[in-house]
A protein has these predicted regions:
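Short peripheral tails and domain-boundary helices/loops at the edges of structured domains
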Residues: 30-76
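Long, positively charged leader/targeting segments at protein N-termini
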Residues: 1-16, 20-29, 34-40, 78-233
């Protein structure tokens, strides 16, 4: 049976009752008081995010915010390498270690695409990931994750992350990210707990306040939302 317009598909709180983060966001990567504080201090001290490539326009019709993608990839790779000590261990342990992404193909595999536009796109994406990794390594030195770990994390972010304009961040949302596996994925919206946002709600200052206070949740509703999932792929 088809779902009705506005019906909730899935909803996830951004923070739990103790104000601890549930979602892994680019904001948390720079939060020196959060669970990623050790990484955040290094990222902020080295101004690492300013070294990334920013927003890149793509001939496929949508931009790639590589700064946010690389920032989130760094945090994800770090969490994987921390193992038992990772804050998001339960989440990262469930992520597949093989990602269906052209940027993960080796040269021999790409040769099979000879003559296709995909091969050039894959090469550009691989070069971009290498550039972002080199910026990471130059800033963090020996504390940087391995290139293979970073490359996997970057591909995972592009496959699963949501851009949340209302919270000005990109996020990996445990559970909800399963719906973000295609360009036509349902849209998402940021809501107050117990309150449904609509297009006529102009109380932007209040929206910022509830987001900062941890009273936000990300919800997928049929046909409703401000940010199309998958637009950063």
């Amino acid at each position: 049976e088809d779902m009705a317009q506005g019906e909730v598909i899935f909803s996830l709180r951004m923070r739990d009752d103790d104000d601890a983060p549930i979602a892994l966001t680019t904001t948390e990567v720079e939060n020196e008081r959060g669970p990623l504080r050790t990484l955040a201090k290094m990222v902020n001290a080295t101004r690492l995010t300013s070294r990334y490539s920013g927003v890149i326009e793509d001939e496929w019709g949508f931009p790639l915010d590589s700064t946010r993608a690389a920032t989130l990839a760094l945090a994800l790779a770090r969490e994987v390498e921390l193992g038992d000590d990772a804050y998001w261990r339960a989440y990262v342990d469930l992520l597949p270690r093989e990602v269906d992404s052209l940027q993960m193909w080796d040269d021999d595999e790409l040769e099979a695409l000879q003559g296709s536009r995909l091969i050039e796109r894959a090469r550009r994406r691989r070069a971009l990931v290498r550039r972002e990794y080199e910026a990471t390594r130059e800033a963090l030195g020996a504390t940087a994750p391995s290139y293979e770990s970073f490359r996997w994390a970057y591909a995972t972010v592009l496959a699963r992350a949501f851009v949340l304009p209302d919270l000005n961040c990109m996020a990996l949302l445990p559970g909800l990210d399963l719906y973000n596996s295609a360009r036509d994925a349902e849209k998402c919206t940021v809501e107050r707990l117990g309150h449904v946002e609509d297009d006529d709600d102009e109380d932007d200052d209040e929206d910022v306040a509830f987001a900062n206070e941890g009273e936000a949740q990300v919800t997928l509703r049929v046909g409703i939302g401000g940010a199309a999932a998958g637009t950063q792929l």
